Amino acid sequence: MIYDVNSPLFRSFLSQKGGSSDKRKTEEQKPKEHRPKASENKPIMTE
């Protein structure tokens, strides 16, 4: 996989996790965290 290190999103992504070695873990946790977050964001967006 090729990651755009110059991308601000990629840099902030590493900053939040605090390490590029967590890339694999974060990718597996992303879908799990997005599921509950998406449900919580739905009512907030409809308001």
Curated annotation (Swiss-Prot):
Gene designation per UniProt: PR4
Question: Per the UniProt entry, what species is this protein from, by scientific name?
Answer: Phaseolus vulgaris
InterPro entries the UniProt entry points to: Wound_ind (IPR012643)
Top-level taxon of origin = Eukaryota
- Where is it made, tissue-wise? Abundant in radicals and epicotyls of seedlings and higher in the roots than in stems and leaves of mature plants.
What name is this protein filed under? Wound-induced basic protein
What up-regulates or down-regulates this gene?
A: By wounding.
Q: Which Pfam families match?
A: Wound_ind
Please note every region of biased composition (Basic and acidic residues).
20-40
Write out the ranges of the annotated region (Disordered). Answer: 1-47
